[in-house]
Regions:
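Active-site/ligand-binding neighborhood in enzyme catalytic cores
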Residues: 136-259, 266-269
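Glycine-rich FAD pyrophosphate-binding loop
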Residues: 26-49
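Conserved flavin/dinucleotide-binding core of flavoenzymes
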Residues: 103-106, 325-326, 331-539
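Mid-domain catalytic core of redox enzymes
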Residues: 28, 217-218, 246-377, 382-388, ...
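N-terminal glycine-rich dinucleotide-binding loop that anchors FAD/FMN and/or NAD(P) in oxidoreductases
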Residues: 47-72
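N-terminal Rossmann-like FAD-binding beta1-loop-alpha1 element of flavoenzymes
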Residues: 7-34
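Mobile amphipathic helical/loop "lid" adjacent to a hydrophobic cofactor/ligand pocket
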Residues: 70, 74-75, 79-198, 486, ...
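Conserved Rossmann-like nucleotide-cofactor binding loop
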Residues: 17, 40, 289
């Protein structure tokens, strides 16, 4: 029941998951304190280069099935903050490998026939026979969620092993699947859980013909366009307290070990410690790196919630983000591009985006106070440990001399007039084989601690968006707040609205997928009684 004295929740981490949790709790009348190491996690102060030009830590797209983020923009009355859906191109040392069209522009057919027909002429080098070799993977996808035990069997296999057992051709693996995974899950298939790999490929590419359609922020940054309006509303209307430049250093628990009572913090600017008292619950919207650091300094909490300690031991992936301002406009056919198999990448995957094409109406904003000169390129390197060891100039030279000219030779004659290179070590979750049980659950052993993020196991609140995904992170944040409210761990003062925040499901599976799963389950459940499995699951 609503009360006159609302509960107090501390949300640690101000990514999509943290903001989702803050929204669901604030709107239920709960008092919320949101803390993050960023100087200004509200998005009100744009991230900028030393010369005052805008910068963003990674260029992230918004796919077709992002219903809850779309609903957020409508709720905030933001108008259209996105580009149209765009094409993408895939490049290797051999040149253009494939282009991804805007699938929604063509006649809509059942999946995967629609994707096959829409791209029949888009693969420039990969023979049809190699493309068809992926058929076995579609059967495995039908089997993936038959039951928990089967899912964990797939989770324990690395994706490359599964691909080979399914007899997917080497060319299909190396020229298509490997590049996709290096920029989708940020690791090569031999280092990824087969289960998460199939979830990603299904959600982003195979669920519907137009699942792969993607659009981008059409001016400024995601933080400025989406998070800043949300944070402003939560602060103005719901008294959200935001502490930027602040790290959570310790969780203190009650003497009986049943709940969190306070959160110790550390200011990055001053080094001073402080304590947030009267805490009723905590939302951990952090990754493995943050979880490990926090549990190391919270021994009582670590002892009571060993699953959080295990989560902190999971691997994480290094990312390098680069932005280049050029003295001339370089024409590139597609605004979004993937680079793979180049020796200069040293095993990483890379993307680059022509921001002057994605944001043509606001080019002056891309240049800050300087006059507009030419193209602005944003590039991200994933699985980038080796790349990160290069100097800033070495990374820029790698792009301008070895990678970008392979896409468009005019890059060779362009001059870089400004640049910014930033490294983000261990910043992205690694879904390694067998990692499912190590990933943190949404509801933990301590009832007053919940987890949120795209790496979190959502259990009975599981959502259709999968992998490294803004929509999944945001929804998991909403559900983390909902969990605290539903279980009455916290209560608010709001009486005019339902306590739990609504979550919009993604589009339903197509009939042929539902039918295929049903038939597979009927057959395989019977065969399981005799100890028979699909051949690719036999040890």
């Amino acid at each position: 029941m609503p009360s006159n004295t609302p509960s107090h929740v501390v949300v640690i981490g101000a990514g999509w998951a943290g903001w989702g949790a803050a929204k669901s709790l604030c709107e239920a009348g709960v008092r919320v304190t949101l803390i993050d190491g960023m100087n200004d996690p509200t998005g009100s102060t744009p991230l900028a280069t030393p010369s005052g030009k805008p910068f963003e830590a990674g260029t992230r797209g918004f796919w077709k099935d992002y219903p809850n983020i779309n609903a957020l923009t409508e709720e905030l009355k933001l108008g259209n903050r996105f580009t149209e859906f765009t094409t993408s191109a895939f490049w290797s040392p051999n040149g253009l490998e494939a282009t991804a069209p805007v699938f929604g522009d063509g006649p809509q057919l059942p999946s995967p026939l629609g994707q096959a027909f829409a791209t029949i002429n888009n693969f420039k080098r990969l023979p049809v026979a190699d493309r068809l070799s992926i058929a076995g993977l579609l059967v495995a996808m039908l089997d993936l969620n038959r039951n928990d035990a089967v899912y964990q069997q797939y989770d324990g296999i690395d994706a490359l092993t599964l691909f080979k057992q399914l007899r997917i051709s080497d060319r299909m693996i190396n020229e298509f699947l490997r590049p996709i995974l290096l920029v989708g899950l940020f690791k090569p298939p031999e280092e990824l859980s087969a289960a998460v790999t199939m979830e990603l490929l299904y959600y982003y590419a195979l669920a519907h013909q137009d699942s792969f359609d993607v659009r981008w922020i059409k001016s400024k940054s995601i933080a400025e366009q989406l998070l800043a309006p949300l944070s402003q509303r939560l602060r103005n209307q719901h008294h959200l307290d935001v502490l930027g430049g602040t790290l959570a250093s310790r969780l203190n628990v009650s003497p009986d070990g049943t709940s969190v009572t306070s959160v110790e913090t550390n200011s990055l600017a001053t080094g001073r410690s402080a304590v947030i008292h009267d805490v009723d619950a905590v939302v951990l919207a952090v990754g493995a790196k943050g979880m490990e650091a926090l549990m190391a300094k919270s021994p009582e909490c670590a002892a009571l919630s060993p699953e959080l300690v295990r989560a902190g031991t999971l691997g994480a992936i290094d990312v390098v983000s680069v932005r280049l301002w050029l003295d001339r406009t370089v024409p590139v056919a597609d605004p979004a591009n993937v680079l793979s198999r180049f020796q200069a990448l040293q095993g990483s995957g890379a993307t680059f985006f022509m921001l002057d094409q994605l944001q043509p109406d606001t080019q002056q904003e891309l240049w800050g106070a300087d006059p507009v000169q030419g193209s602005v390129v944003a590039s991200d390197f994933y699985n980038s440990t080796a790349i990160a060891e290069l100097s800033d100039q070495g990374i820029v030279d790698c792009l301008m001399q070895e990678l970008l000219p392979m896409v468009q030779p005019d890059f060779r004659t362009a001059q870089v007039v400004d640049q910014d290179v930033r490294r983000y070590p261990r910043s992205v979750s690694l879904f390694s084989p067998g990692s499912f049980k190590q990933r943190p659950p949404l509801e933990t052993s301590m009832s007053s601690i919940v987890c949120a993020g795209d790496w979190v196991r959502m259990e009975d609140r599981e959502f259709g968006a999968k992998g490294l995904c803004q929509e999944r992170a945001y929804v998991c944040g909403l559900e983390a707040g909902n969990s605290l409210l539903k279980r009455k761990i916290v209560s608010g003062t709001t009486q005019s609205q339902p306590l739990q925040h609504p979550v919009i499901p993604i589009r339903a599976d197509e009939p042929q997928v539902v039918f295929g799963r049903t038939i597979n389950k009927l057959v395989m459940d019977q065969l399981d009684l005799f100890g028979l499995k699909h051949p690719w699951l036999r040890s």
